[in-house]
């Protein structure tokens, strides 16, 4: 059986196929012309007398011509298909080039997006920082508005540092030392502040209260140098002296120097007394207050929380000092916009004050006022109004007795005047009557409460009630000495417990006393008229004279009763000799006085 051998198939390119097809078309067209030429005579003979076999030839030619036409048509189709494939390939190349460009553009867009995201992140951080600064500026603006409410002569005489009110020193918040404070200190490490350091602290306060920092600072530095020579740097007395010097620096607005000293004191006390000692908590609180004055609320908050933990552990969760620390922590959170935490801390502080100190303690009204301010910022106006009314009612009961039909607090009179204003058709003002005596309640907290409650009445349309409260607040301001100043004068001149005073540019100039000197003994005693109050003058000149006389009395007491005017250029050694006489200790060889730590 024979086997067919097929020719080997070769792959032709598209161009070769096109060229071959064109050659075939030319051959078919030539062949078609020849067939037509042969077919024409045969067709004419077919119409006449046909020759034998002409019909068969004519039929074959026509069939061949049809096949040729079919071949030409297919060849044209192949050429058209080739042209279409070429166009498709060209379009494909264009699309590929476009894809490459899109890939490059996509990569560029990704890089642009990454850069934009980084810019957005930096912008969000900047916005958060600006928002925090905005909140701080808003709070400072509110403080300034409160300052503008003061009488003009007060603003001229006593420039007010709002941060001193925002972060009051611990000794200012508590009118008396915590009961059993010395026992607590003895139980936790056995360290008690020596009487000589307490006396030195009081003397430094007297000098600084007169703005005589050129005497107070060298006095502190000399005492610190002597303590380091006798006891070494890592001694609790050195830490106490560092605290005193830091508070003097803080009053001079030298915050960086004060922070450095407080951190050094903190390290010493943690090393010598332990991390859970009350003195460590006091130093932490002072450091937090310092950061708060500089606007570093985030850095201050963990320090304040740690001080709170120590005091809760040492004193218990219901001690007044714990409430004091809670109030400081609430102030820090308030400046960071943490409204819920502020409310929680103030509620705890209020519960402690009311339980341990009684409802008539000034700290109760002050904490209620702060809590009401927190409610205002949260939009809880009804809760804030309730607290303000409680403050006014309690102040009225404390001053004038229980509330009854005729003895009503000022806010009740204000609302009665609001209700009866439409009945007074002649529009004559009401007689002051019994509510006028409520203006005699001269407390700074009550005065602030009157103004704030009046501001709450105005959006409610209670203009008459608002005017009544504001009028009462103004009358309270005009009576004698300003309430805030009167309170500080009484604490300074009558308390005799070594409390700290405000900075030199305020009502009572000088550094705030160190928080950890809560167990300190009596300081300078005031032997004035015994009333504990001063009459108001056109300026604070009399107050400064009183402070100067108090300083002279302290120096005479330290000298043993001899009259001597403290000199602004007094040498450090002389000041230390006063201290030496006050505690009746012998002078060390060489005539130099050394402050020793008595445990």
From Swiss-Prot:
Origin superkingdom: Eukaryota
Keywords: Coiled coil, Cytoplasm, Cytoskeleton, Lysosome, Membrane, Microtubule, Motor protein, Phosphoprotein, Repeat, TPR repeat
Gene3D superfamilies in UniProt: Tetratricopeptide repeat domain
TPR repeat feature ranges: 197-230, 239-272, 281-314, 323-356, 365-398, 447-480
Main location group: cytoplasm
GO cellular component, one term: neuron projection
Residue stretches of biased makeup (Low complexity): 532-541
UniProt-annotated stretches for the region Disordered: 154-188, 492-541
Membrane topology recorded in Swiss-Prot or TrEMBL: Peripheral membrane protein
Compartments reported by the entry: Cytoplasm, Cytoskeleton; Lysosome membrane
PROSITE patterns, alphabetized: KINESIN_LIGHT, TPR, TPR_REGION
Family according to the record: Belongs to the kinesin light chain family.
Cited function: Kinesin is a microtubule-associated force-producing protein that plays a role in organelle transport. The light chain functions in coupling of cargo to the heavy chain or in the modulation of its ATPase activity. Through binding with PLEKHM2 and ARL8B, recruits kinesin-1 to lysosomes and hence direct lysosomes movement toward microtubule plus ends.
Name of the protein: Kinesin light chain 2
């Amino acid at each position: 059986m024979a086997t067919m051998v097929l020719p080997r198939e070769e792959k032709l390119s598209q161009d070769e196929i096109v060229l071959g097809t064109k050659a075939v078309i030319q051959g078919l067209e030539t062949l078609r012309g020849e067939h037509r030429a042969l077919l024409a005579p045969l067709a004419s003979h077919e119409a006449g007398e046909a020759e034998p076999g002409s019909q068969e030839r004519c039929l074959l030619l026509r069939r061949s011509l049809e096949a040729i036409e079919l071949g030409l048509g297919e060849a044209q189709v192949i050429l058209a298909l080739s042209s279409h494939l070429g166009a498709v390939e060209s379009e494909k190349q264009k699309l590929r080039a476009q894809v490459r460009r899109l890939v490059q553009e996509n990569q560029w867009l990704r890089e642009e997006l990454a850069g934009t995201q980084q810019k957005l992140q930096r912008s969000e951080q900047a916005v958060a920082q600006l928002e925090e600064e905005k909140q701080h500026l808003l709070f400072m603006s509110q403080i300034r508005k409160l300052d503008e409410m003061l009488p003009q002569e007060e603003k001229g005489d006593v420039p007010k540092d709002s941060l001193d009110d925002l972060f009051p020193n611990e000794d200012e918040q508590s009118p008396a030392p915590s009961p059993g404070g010395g026992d607590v200190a003895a139980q936790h490490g056995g360290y008690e502040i020596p009487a000589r350091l307490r006396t030195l602290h009081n003397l430094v306060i007297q000098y600084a209260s007169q703005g005589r920092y050129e005497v107070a600072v060298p006095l502190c530095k000399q005492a610190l140098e002597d303590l380091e020579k006798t006891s070494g740097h890592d001694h609790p007395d050195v830490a106490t002296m560092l605290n005193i010097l830091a508070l003097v620096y803080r009053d001079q607005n030298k915050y960086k120097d004060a922070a450095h000293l407080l951190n050094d004191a903190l390290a010493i006390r943690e090393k010598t007394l332990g991390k859970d000692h009350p003195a460590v908590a006091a130093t932490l609180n002072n450091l937090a207050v310092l950061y708060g004055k500089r606007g570093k609320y985030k850095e201050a908050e963990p320090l304040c929380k740690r001080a709170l933990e120590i005091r809760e552990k040492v004193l218990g969760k219901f001690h007044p000092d714990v409430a004091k620390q809670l109030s400081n922590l609430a102030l820090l959170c308030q400046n960071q916009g943490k409204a819920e935490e502020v409310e929680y801390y103030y509620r705890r502080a209020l519960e402690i004050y009311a339980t341990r100190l009684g409802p008539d303690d000034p700290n109760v009204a002050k904490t209620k006022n702060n809590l009401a301010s927190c409610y205002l910022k949260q939009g809880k106006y009804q809760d804030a109004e309730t607290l303000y009314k409680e403050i006014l009612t309690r102040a009225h009961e404390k001053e004038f007795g229980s509330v009854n039909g005729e003895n009503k607090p000022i806010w009740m009179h204000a609302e009665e005047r609001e209700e009866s204003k439409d009945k007074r058709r002649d529009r004559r003002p009401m007689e002051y009557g019994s509510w006028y005596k409520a203006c005699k309640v001269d407390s700074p907290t009550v005065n602030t409460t009157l103004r704030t409650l009046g501001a709450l009445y105005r959006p409610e349309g209670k203009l008459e009630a608002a005017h009544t409260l504001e009028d009462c607040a103004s009358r309270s301001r005009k009576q004698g000495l300003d309430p805030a100043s009167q309170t500080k004068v009484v604490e300074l001149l009558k308390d005799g417990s070594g409390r700290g005073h405000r900075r030199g540019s305020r009502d009572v100039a000088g550094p705030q006393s160190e928080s950890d000197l809560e167990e300190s003994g009596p300081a300078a005693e005031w032997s004035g008229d015994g009333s504990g109050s001063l009459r108001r003058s056109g300026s604070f000149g009399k107050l400064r004279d009183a402070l100067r006389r108090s300083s002279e009395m302290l120096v005479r007491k330290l000298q043993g009763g001899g009259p001597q005017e403290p000199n602004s250029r007094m040498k450090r050694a002389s000041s230390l000799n006063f201290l030496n006489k006050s505690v009746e200790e012998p002078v060390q060889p060489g005539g130099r006085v050394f402050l020793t730590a008595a445990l």
